[in-house]
Amino acid sequence: MTNESRKRKVRGSQIRSSRGDKKQGRSQSRDDKEIERLERQNDARGQESSTHVDEGFVPEEQSFIETESVNRVESRMERWLDVGRPVHLIGPTGCGKTSLAMHVARERDRPVVWINGDAELTTSDLVGEYAEKERISEHDQFIHNVVKSKDIIRDRWVDNPLTLAVQEGATLVYNEFSRTKPVANNVLLSVFEEGVLELPGKRGKSRYVDVHPEFRTILTSNSVEYAGVHEPQDALLDRLIGIYMDFYDLDTEIEIVRAHVDKSADTNVEDIVRVLRELRERLDITVGTRAAIMANEGATTVDTVDQAVLTDICTDVLASKVAQRSDVRGLREEIESAIDDMEVALS
């Protein structure tokens, strides 16, 4: 017996694919090719709309005041954005972080994408997920009076803000960044370091997205002593440029408040801003520029603002910051004392 014949001889049973397995494999291969063909066909017809940046979900631009103090912080932010570094604005609530972030983002003349962080935000909320069903259809009437129809229904991936910003080269404004749990923000590590966004949960070769060279990020956070603030992990903080903000100087705050109130009723703006700044020093609660804007809005509803009216207005504006009703009395007394000590001349 030759070696060739010995090699061909097989003892025992052989394991072969069943006819059913072979048929199923051929069927699966045909289905995959059919889906690819229909996708190309639908793309050519424009049946599938691509996701793109929609700035309709970005907060409207508010009046923005340019002063020396504002320009100083703005220039620092732009310096780092110009070299592609993400900027993290940190400061007390109501000091103007969000307004400044939105202004700087719009000045870049690129699309702006907005995210508002909170404890319930997940990685999927940032990058996207399979959240819809799509139908791929083919209708063929090659023969007269004979219509061939085929529908394939499958999961459809929906891009969320971070993915859209990365793809389009937009400026991402991530407001209240530190209110999001750190695990959800892990996806930012590869974006800032390797220039690649990984889409957890996405299948196939499109799981990775190259970061557009014009993509930039501005994050805003309250200081860590505020309730509901999570401290980001060191690996991420190591890749951020941190710029700490405080409340603006008196002249800047006056100009900001004037820009937000009726011009015909701004005679008390300076006095009210001074009172709120004094309360900022005296009280254990945060008294921001936003509180001064609200107080001046309240003052525009009366003909004359005397000390009693101003006390009521300031108490109403700040009462939501105290823990319980019994604390309001002490708050009111502090406000009355500050107004008396400053000898505010109201009209």
From Swiss-Prot:
<dbReference type="InterPro" id="IPR013462">
    <property type="entry name" value="Gas-vesicle_GvpN"/>
</dbReference>
<dbReference type="GO" id="GO:0005737">
    <property type="term" value="C:cytoplasm"/>
</dbReference>
<comment type="function">
    <text>Expression of a 9.5 kb p-vac DNA fragment containing 2 divergently transcribed regions (gvpD-gvpE-gvpF-gvpG-gvpH-gvpI-gvpJ-gvpK-gvpL-gvpM and gvpA-gvpC-gvpN-gvpO) allows H.volcanii to produce gas vesicles. A similar region restores gas vesicle production in H.halobium without the p-vac locus, but which still have the c-vac locus.</text>
</comment>
<keyword id="KW-0378">Hydrolase</keyword>
<feature type="compositionally biased region" description="Basic and acidic residues">
    <location>
        <begin position="18"/>
        <end position="55"/>
    </location>
</feature>
<dbReference type="InterPro" id="IPR050764">
    <property type="entry name" value="CbbQ/NirQ/NorQ/GpvN"/>
</dbReference>
<dbReference type="GO" id="GO:0031412">
    <property type="term" value="P:gas vesicle organization"/>
</dbReference>
<comment type="subunit">
    <text>Forms homodimers, forms a GvpN1-GvpO1 heterodimer, interacts with GvpC1 (via the latter's C-terminus) and GvpL, might interact with GvpA1.</text>
</comment>
<feature type="compositionally biased region" description="Basic residues">
    <location>
        <begin position="1"/>
        <end position="11"/>
    </location>
</feature>
<dbReference type="GO" id="GO:0016887">
    <property type="term" value="F:ATP hydrolysis activity"/>
</dbReference>
<feature type="region of interest" description="Disordered">
    <location>
        <begin position="1"/>
        <end position="64"/>
    </location>
</feature>
<dbReference type="InterPro" id="IPR003593">
    <property type="entry name" value="AAA+_ATPase"/>
</dbReference>
<comment type="function">
    <text>An ATPase that functions in gas vesicle formation. A minor component of the gas vesicle, also found in soluble extracts. Probably enhances gas vesicle formation. Gas vesicles are hollow, gas filled proteinaceous nanostructures found in several microbial planktonic microorganisms. They allow positioning of halobacteria at the optimal depth for growth in the poorly aerated, shallow brine pools of their habitat.</text>
</comment>
<dbReference type="GO" id="GO:0031411">
    <property type="term" value="C:gas vesicle"/>
</dbReference>
<keyword id="KW-0067">ATP-binding</keyword>
<comment type="similarity">
    <text>Belongs to the CbbQ/NirQ/NorQ/GpvN family.</text>
</comment>
<protein>
    <recommendedName>
        <fullName>Gas vesicle ATPase GvpN1</fullName>
        <ecNumber>3.6.4.-</ecNumber>
    </recommendedName>
</protein>
<keyword id="KW-0963">Cytoplasm</keyword>
<dbReference type="InterPro" id="IPR027417">
    <property type="entry name" value="P-loop_NTPase"/>
</dbReference>
<keyword id="KW-0304">Gas vesicle</keyword>
<feature type="binding site">
    <location>
        <begin position="91"/>
        <end position="98"/>
    </location>
    <ligand>
        <name>ATP</name>
    </ligand>
</feature>
<keyword id="KW-0547">Nucleotide-binding</keyword>
<dbReference type="InterPro" id="IPR011704">
    <property type="entry name" value="ATPase_dyneun-rel_AAA"/>
</dbReference>
<keyword id="KW-0614">Plasmid</keyword>
<dbReference type="GO" id="GO:0005524">
    <property type="term" value="F:ATP binding"/>
</dbReference>
<dbReference type="Pfam" id="PF07728">
    <property type="entry name" value="AAA_5"/>
</dbReference>
